[in-house]
Amino acid sequence: MEIKQVLFNDENWKKLIDFVKSSSWSESPIIAKNWEEYNYLEWERIFAAFENDNIIGHCSFNNVDCVPDVDYTPYIQSVFVNEKYRGERVSEKLINTAIEYAKSLGFKEVYIVSGHINFYEKYGFIKIDEKKEYRGVLQGIYRKEI
């Protein structure tokens, strides 16, 4: 398995968008639309996990996430792994790749917004806040010092 950056203008962009659109996650249509329409800052990135040239998972590294009126940044978001590959530490590899990228940019901490309990803690994230996201659903905000 290999983790690669996927930029909107590279050869894997369409493959990534097709993977997102066809995935089982209920957020996938929103994520695909946002990724296609988003005006990326120079340092923001999307990472994809590849197995034999097939995308099996993804995450993004962005300035903002789905919770308004907070000063936290940057975020690792949209972490998803195909069901067939769960349990193989793909999400951990995606998150660690995003963290290494954040370090290379000089960031000292990263954040994740999630409703999952006891998931990101195993990767060293600590819940620091709770906020309602754009649909009004309460989400935890997790931080990891890097």
At which residue positions do the language-model features occur?
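Conserved active-site alpha-helix within GNAT-family acetyltransferase domains
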Residues: K108, S114-L138
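Short loop/turn motifs at secondary-structure junctions and domain boundaries
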Residues: E37-W43
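Conserved beta-strand in the GNAT
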Residues: A48, N54-V64, Y75, F80
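Short amphipathic alpha-helix that is part of the acyltransferase structural core
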Residues: M1-N34, F50
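Conserved acetyl-CoA-binding loop-helix of GNAT-fold acetyltransferases
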Residues: V81, G87-E100, I112
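A conserved beta-turn-beta hairpin within the catalytic core of GNAT-like acetyltransferases
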Residues: V64-I76, R86, Y134
